Amino acid sequence: MTYFVLFLGLCFVLGGLAVASNPSPYYGVVGLVLASVAGCGWLLSLGVSFVSLVLFMVYLGGMLVVFVYSVSLAADPFPEAWGDWGVVGYGVGFVVVLVAGLIVGGSIGSLDFGVVTVDSVGMFSVRLDFGGVAMFYSCGVGMLLVAGWGLLLTLFVVLELVRGLSRGAIRAV
């Protein structure tokens, strides 16, 4: 279980690195999805399964909407890939800065690889915290409705902003 949590942490850092050095929106969304899956898996291993599920749904839903709009606004005929030298240079530079920060901060020698999960037994150590669902919908229903209306308004604003001169954003092919 410790190695699994460390692997999720490594995937989270690599996903953030992929987002930071993304050459185009086509490839940046891969890093976002990797980072969100790894982060939610990390939360799941620590025992907060409901929060992990909600964050996973919000992150993936929001990221897919942002991905669609950024691809529609920045459609490049020849997008750069991760194998190009400029992108590899950014990635190597970010890793060098990360390692230098760890060395300067003195954290490189004191890294403790002991990860404690909820029960510290087995791979499926998920606490039953689904009592938060009832609290979320009973006490937070007002904010949930306000957030839903805000997201709907944002959707219509973005659709209005990206439409062409004579055609809307949703075109018939």
Curated annotation (Swiss-Prot):
Lipid bilayer topology: Multi-pass membrane protein
Cell location: Mitochondrion membrane
Family matches, as Gene3D superfamilies: NADH-ubiquinone/plastoquinone oxidoreductase chain 6, subunit NuoJ
Domain of life, per lineage: Eukaryota
Catalyzed reaction equations: a ubiquinone + NADH + 5 H(+)(in) = a ubiquinol + NAD(+) + 4 H(+)(out)
This enzyme's EC code(s): 7.1.1.2
Gene Ontology CC entries for this record: mitochondrial membrane
InterPro entries associated with the record: ComplexI_Subunit6, NADH_UbQ/plastoQ_OxRdtase_su6, Nuo/plastoQ_OxRdtase_6_NuoJ
Keywords: Electron transport, Membrane, Mitochondrion, NAD, Respiratory chain, Translocase, Transmembrane, Transmembrane helix, Transport, Ubiquinone
GO molecular function, one term: NADH dehydrogenase (ubiquinone) activity
Intrachain S-S bonds: none
Biological role: Core subunit of the mitochondrial membrane respiratory chain NADH dehydrogenase (Complex I) that is believed to belong to the minimal assembly required for catalysis. Complex I functions in the transfer of electrons from NADH to the respiratory chain. The immediate electron acceptor for the enzyme is believed to be ubiquinone.
The protein, known as: NADH-ubiquinone oxidoreductase chain 6
Gene coding for it: MT-ND6
